[in-house]
Structures are given as structure tokens and as C-alpha cells.
């Protein structure tokens, strides 16, 4: 019996959405996409609230299953469409390393990114304590630099869900606070950009930049261009 097609409610300006889109592209999953415009408040429409009371994207519907967190969605899709693969390792300790970094992304990195972005949208860039947020996000850079001391990827020698989750948020933070002072992180980011699946991050990232410029009057630093150079 064939599986029902997953339905992903999304706004690609959201970093967690983009991590799901990267996995979908990487595994070539046939998914129905339904756009929810966060900046127009479509997540508060009655039909969507009935589906997801958290009024957030991504939201995945797969048969009778409804998932409202990107990390749960990543795990679910990997278990369904990458069975036996290395994105969500089979060995317990390795899987827990990946889970630990998924939780780092949602509770530490993305939270700090979201705090800054939300303040900029609500208050306008001129009224935000940018230095405070830069310190908080630089701390996240320092932590990730340490994660990469002994491995090429965040959770070990191979690409995992942790990398897909982290790279979309990091690429957003890099627009605002370039990571040029962190060589291991730059090397990892460059490697991630060379994946075919990274293309699924690019459109939403640019749309977010444009939205922040227009809504929050955010002044992006001139050095915030996406890292493209080879790092030896």
C-alpha cells in the first residue's frame, strides 16, 4: 500500500521551513507545498489554527499525522524516506549526538536569531540594541566553532539532520553578523553551500533579506554576502 503524499505548510522565509525544504530536495521526496504568508498573518486563519494551534510553520500533514516542529518533521521524513541512511543514524549514541544538536538549534541558536529578528520587525532597526544581540549570536558562533574542532560536520564525520537544521538558521544570522572570524564554521558553511540541496535554502533566504530591509529597515552590513569562497 502506497504512502499518502506529505503536505508541508510553509513560508520559505522561515529558517526551520528551509531546513525541511533542504531535506525534501536531498531525498527527492514528493511533497505537496501549501504557502502560508506569515507576514500577512495567514497562520492565524481559522482553518490553519484548527490544524496547528501554535500558528507556526513548518507544519507537516502525513496521513493522520500532524507535526508542528521542524525537528520532528526532519526526523519523521528521514525515518520514512531515508531508512537505513546516515542522516538520522541507526546507532543509539550517534543518533543522540544528532538529537542533541537539533535541540541546540531550536533552544539556543534559533531562539537567539528569532529574538533579534522579532525585535527588529516590532521596533524597527534603529530602536534595537544590536550590540546585545550580536553578543548573544556570537556566543552561538563560538559554540559551533568548538563543535567542529574534531569533525567535518556538526555531529561527526557525515552529514546529518543536525547540519540541515543548523545551516538554514546560520545562513540567516550570517546576513546580519558575518561569521568571517570563525574558520572552521566558514569551512563547514562553504561545504554545506556546495550541496545540491542547499539550493532549497537560497530563495527563502533572499526573500527574508528583502522583507527585513522593507519591514524592519534593517541595515545589513556590506560584508554579509553569502560565503562562496573555497576555504583550504
Curated annotation (Swiss-Prot):
One of its GO terms (molecular function) is glutathione transferase activity. Disruption phenotype: Embryonic lethal. Embryos display severe developmental defects such as poorly differentiated cuticle, failure of head involution, abnormal gut looping, and defective mouth hooks and dorsal closure. Trichromes are absent. Embryos have a higher sterol content. Embryonic lethality, defective epidermal differentiation and trichome development can be rescued by supplementing embryos with 20-hydroxyecdysone (20E), ecdysone or cholesterol. RNAi-mediated knockdown results in larval lethality at the second instar stage, which can be rescued by supplementing larvae with 20E, ecdysone or cholesterol. It catalyses: RX + glutathione = an S-substituted glutathione + a halide anion + H(+). It holds the Pfam family GST_C. The keyword Transferase applies. GO terms for cellular component: cytoplasm. GO terms for biological process: cholesterol homeostasis; ecdysteroid biosynthetic process; glutathione metabolic process; response to toxic substance. CDD domains: GST_C_Delta_Epsilon (cd03177), GST_N_Delta_Epsilon (cd03045). The keyword Transferase applies. Its EC number is 2.5.1.18. Keywords: Detoxification, Lipid biosynthesis, Lipid metabolism, Steroid biosynthesis, Transferase. Expressed in the adult ovary (at protein level). Signal peptide: none annotated. Residues 4-85 form the GST N-terminal domain. Belongs to the GST superfamily. Epsilon family. Member of the Halloween gene group. Conjugation of reduced glutathione to a wide number of exogenous and endogenous hydrophobic electrophiles. Essential for ecdysteroid biosynthesis. May be involved in detoxification. This is Glutathione S-transferase E14.
